[in-house]
């Protein structure tokens, strides 16, 4: 019979996704067949599986940590906000519809038996399932129809461990408030608490631990020290802490336009881990500076984000940068924005029917109701072999003054040839639909060499850090950190359904 444990949090960005990934790697290293599961994920960061199904990036990185291929069953429901009031609802990798919050709140009850069936299929194939909740289980205005926190735990009778982020402050209030806002049945499901991102001497924390255990009758089974691990971040909350000022000691200054509806910002994780590269997110004109490369990322609402560029003055700044021989790369929605105009006659993404683009590429995009979701391999215009994935609802046509960026050779593992993207005559402006393009070592190394040569400097002096190898190392570090700082015997008892009591044992931080 499958063992299961559910990680819920006191708030968004408490560390749920990372904790799930770490536990997956920890159990994998112990020889267990383990998978992650999140019934419903709201995110603009998504991935395409080998079967062409769309799922949340968090469950992809958790699957990597577990040593298994990403499977859409690990994230059956994906919500991708299109604006402040509406989301695209995706079930088992395929679009169902666009819904507002009220409509979806009523509709999601119909998904419960389907979610249960999906979960059972994973349970039949694995030793352990590590479930992840969303936000906080104490969203008392939504709990009557919850399918992702206590509602999911009840569906499969999963024990819950609550994780709280002490780095933000108010950790004991958040633990107590979360538990006490739950009803009696829900409170009974919380079997343990983990305090995350702790800095300092745990002895100073112990009086608070003793008091919160007495108040809630729930044991604190771990205190995880703050660790500077280089892991993918899925929650858009994490973008608020990203740099906006360049590092003067870096060899290259790369600026990413932080669009209001930015999607797939995990595309830039490969850039973040490279030595002597300054990566910063530009939110307004004052932060633009003098970058060596500007990247326009993907967007879930390209037309409205194009309007943001116009209103913020960033459109003119990017155009001026390009006119002065600056290098600009657009990914997916960013590629569409580089063109002359974008048309949305069926209002697929926005109420706007048409908007002018940046005019840096001789291209035109029309939005279609059919989404393209594929994994691809190909060869760029300069001969680099690349792989990645596509997620878009637009069709872009090139004019005579542009050439293709990449020749696609295989789609979802099957031989298929077509052309992707566009590149300007002077080679300075590149647009592509390929997410994950920067994860290709040769392409990235050549890009750095080109940017440095343009500054009359020698080529990039470091070996490109391979993202896959780097992530494997980080997953192992994370697993070791958790094993050293969680009372694993207590966690095992929780997973077996055994009762554990508040302990007088004091946790000791281990780096």
Swiss-Prot record:
The active site is at 332 (nucleophile), 435. PROSITE patterns: GATASE_COBBQ. GO terms for biological process: cobalamin biosynthetic process. The keyword Magnesium does not apply. Gene3D superfamilies: 3.40.50.880, P-loop containing nucleotide triphosphate hydrolases. Residues 251-443 form the GATase cobBQ-type domain. HAMAP family: CobQ (MF_00028). This is Cobyric acid synthase. The lineage of its organism: Bacteria, Bacillati, Bacillota, Bacilli, Bacillales.
């Amino acid at each position: 019979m499958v063992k299961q444990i559910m990680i819920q949090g006191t708030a968004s960005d408490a560390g749920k996704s990372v904790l799930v990934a770490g536990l997956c790697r920890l159990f994998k290293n112990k020889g267990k067949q383990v998978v992650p599961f999140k019934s419903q994920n709201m995110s603009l960061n998504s991935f395409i599986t080998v079967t062409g199904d769309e799922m949340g990036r968090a469950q992809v990185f958790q699957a990597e940590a577990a040593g298994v291929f990403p499977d859409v069953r690990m994230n059956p429901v994906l919500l991708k906000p299109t604006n402040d009031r509406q989301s695209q609802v995706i079930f088992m990798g395929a679009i169902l519809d666009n819904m507002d919050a009220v409509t979806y709140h009523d509709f999601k009850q119909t998904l419960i038996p389907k979610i249960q069936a999906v979960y059972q299929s994973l349970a039949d194939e694995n030793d352990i399932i590590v479930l992840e909740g969303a936000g906080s289980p104490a969203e008392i205005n939504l709990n009557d129809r919850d399918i992702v926190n206590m509602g999911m735990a009840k569906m499969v009778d999963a024990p819950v461990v609550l994780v709280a982020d002490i780095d933000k402050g108010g950790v004991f209030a958040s633990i107590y408030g979360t538990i006490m806002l739950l009803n009696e049945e829900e409170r009974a499901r919380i079997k343990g608490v983990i305090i995350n991102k702790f800095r300092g001497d745990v002895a100073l924390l112990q009086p608070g631990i003793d008091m919160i255990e007495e108040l809630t009758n729930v044991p604190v089974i771990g205190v995880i020290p703050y660790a500077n691990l280089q892991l993918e971040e899925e929650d858009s909350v994490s973008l608020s802490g990203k740099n906006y000022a360049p590092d003067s000691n870096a060899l290259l200054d790369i600026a990413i336009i932080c669009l209001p509806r930015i999607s797939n910002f995990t595309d830039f994780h490969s850039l973040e881990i490279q030595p002597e590269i300054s990566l910063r997110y530009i939110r307004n004109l004052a932060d633009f500076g003098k970058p060596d490369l500007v990247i326009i990322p993907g967007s879930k609402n390209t037309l409205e984000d194009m309007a943001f560029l116009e209103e913020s003055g960033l459109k003119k700044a990017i155009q001026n940068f390009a006119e002065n021989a600056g290098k600009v790369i657009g990914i997916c929605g960013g590629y569409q924005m580089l063109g002359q105009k974008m048309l949305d006659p069926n209002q697929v993404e926005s109420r706007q029917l048409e908007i002018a683009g940046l005019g840096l590429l001789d291209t035109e995009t029309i939005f279609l109701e059919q989404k393209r979701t594929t994994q691809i391999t190909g060869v760029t215009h300069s001969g680099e072999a690349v792989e990645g994935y596509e997620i878009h609802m637009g069709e872009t046509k090139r004019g005579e003054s542009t050439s293709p960026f990449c020749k696609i050779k295989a789609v979802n593992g099957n031989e298929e040839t077509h052309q992707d993207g566009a590149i300007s005559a002077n080679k300075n402006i590149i647009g592509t639909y390929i997410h994950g393009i920067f994860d290709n070592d040769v392409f990235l190394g050549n890009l750095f060499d080109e940017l440095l040569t343009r500054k009359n400097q020698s080529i990039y002096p470091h070996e490109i850090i391979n993202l896959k190898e780097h992530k494997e190392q980080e997953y192992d570090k994370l697993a070791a950190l958790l094993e050293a700082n969680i009372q694993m015997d207590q966690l095992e008892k929780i997973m077996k359904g055994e009762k554990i009591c508040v302990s007088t044992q004091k946790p000791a931080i281990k780096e």
